[in-house]
């Protein structure tokens, strides 16, 4: 969890750092700013190096040792089943935690998508322009403006603050013996953080919001799989954990597919889309 958030922290800070040392964070329409391009290049390089290092250093359990450790007998290995049967027999925790996961990951998908526009409009007073598409006029933020690009850099700082909050909260979670209580408390704090963004118009006050969101993020990365593995018995743990990853992917697909439709419902004619409502 620490390394995950440490990597996030570095990635979020790259655009801000590059802009601070003089690399342009402004570009013409349809062109990606240099500060963002260099951030992606460095991120890709770090990812490749980490994958190579992990592949070279991490060794798998020998099958015999894995079977002995998990109490898997030769007879149980012969038992064949499919994913649908496993889902029917899944423990209650698989479904209850899965439902919670659905709404958590949908919320974070909206955050990653709409935070930039929210901060640009509500905090940095980004100017708006009117565009015409297929004969329909729309009021949108001027993405080429200095305010919008500055807001984008600041969002990187906010996400870095979220990562710091997540690391700090991750050290507190083990002190709470009841895992369900720790999970609930973390998500409530994260929810308060999301709601508070609607009322905050100061760039530094948003630090508090994203620290609270970091509490939810820490719990989402650690507790669901812990709760699930403790509820599992038998030799299908790997399959169940793989299926459980669907509670991460599916909600993001749904949120990405429906987000624009929901935002349009909030948008009044002649007004810029209130992306803060999505948070």
Please state what every model-predicted region is.
Residues 1-3, 232-244:
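Loop-to-transmembrane helix entry/capping segments in MFS-fold secondary transporters
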Residues 20-45, 261-279:
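A membrane-interface helix-boundary motif in multi-pass transporters
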Residues 1, 219-233:
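Intracellular juxtamembrane helix-capping segments at the cytosolic ends
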Residues 189-201:
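C-terminal ends and interior cores of transmembrane alpha-helices
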Residues 2-23, 245-256:
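Glycine-rich segments within core transmembrane alpha-helices of 12-TM secondary carriers
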Residues 61-99:
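Juxtamembrane intracellular "pre-TM" segments in multi-pass secondary transporters
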Residues 44-64:
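C-terminal membrane-cytosol helix-exit motif in multi-pass small-molecule transporters
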Residues 34-35, 125-163, 278:
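Loop-to-transmembrane helix entry
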């Amino acid at each position: 969890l620490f390394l995950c958030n440490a990597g996030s922290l570095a990635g979020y800070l790259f655009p801000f750092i590059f802009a601070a040392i003089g690399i342009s964070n402004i570009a013409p329409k349809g062109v990606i700013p240099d500060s963002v391009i260099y951030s992606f290049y460095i991120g890709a390089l770090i990812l490749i190096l980490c994958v190579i290092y992990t592949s070279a250093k991490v060794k798998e359990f020998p099958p015999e040792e894995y079977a002995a450790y998990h109490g898997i007998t030769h007879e149980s290995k012969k038992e064949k089943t499919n994913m649908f049967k496993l889902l029917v027999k899944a423990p209650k925790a698989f479904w209850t935690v899965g439902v919670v996961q659905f709404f958590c990951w949908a919320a974070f998908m909206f955050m990653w998508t709409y935070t930039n526009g929210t901060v640009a409009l509500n905090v940095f007073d980004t100017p708006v322009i009117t565009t015409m598409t297929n004969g329909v006029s729309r009021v949108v933020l001027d993405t080429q403006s200095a305010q919008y690009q500055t807001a984008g850099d600041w969002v990187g700082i906010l996400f870095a603050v979220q990562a710091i909050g997540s690391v700090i909260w991750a050290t507190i979670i083990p002190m709470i013996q009841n895992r369900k209580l720790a999970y609930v408390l973390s998500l409530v704090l994260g929810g308060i953080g999301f709601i508070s963004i609607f009322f905050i118009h100061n760039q530094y006050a948003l630090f508090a919001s994203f620290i609270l969101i970091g509490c939810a993020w820490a719990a989402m990365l650690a507790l669901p799989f812990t709760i699930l593995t403790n509820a599992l018995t038998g030799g299908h743990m790997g399959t169940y954990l793989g299926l459980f990853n669907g509670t991460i992917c599916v909600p993001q697909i749904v949120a990405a597919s429906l987000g624009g439709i929901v935002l349009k419902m909030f948008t009044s004619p002649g007004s810029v889309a209130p992306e803060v409502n999505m948070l």
